[in-house]
Amino acid sequence: MLDTKFDELMEFPSSFPFKIVGDASDTLADRVVAVAQSLAPDDYTPITKVSSKGTYNSVTIRITVTSKEQIEQLYTQLAAIEGVKRVL
């Protein structure tokens, strides 16, 4: 697991923003939502932006998290999506 201090800095449950940057793809947002649904079922409306050259997409999604471990799982699984370069 990751060595984070989310439990010291946050109160749970909390709405937590994730920004995922990946290769330009029409399905990136759908894959991000699928991971979010698997760990924190809810209705999600991700915001997708395309980079100025069209090379990358960024997807921002707010997820209600209930624990430090859940945040760490989300970071790990979102980063494992094919084509993802960064999870912020």
From Swiss-Prot:
Q: Which GO terms describe its cellular component?
A: cytosol
Against Pfam families, the record matches this protein to: DUF493 (PF04359)
Q: Which PANTHER family match?
A: UPF0250 PROTEIN YBED
Assigned protein family = Belongs to the UPF0250 family.
Record protein name field? UPF0250 protein Shal_3239
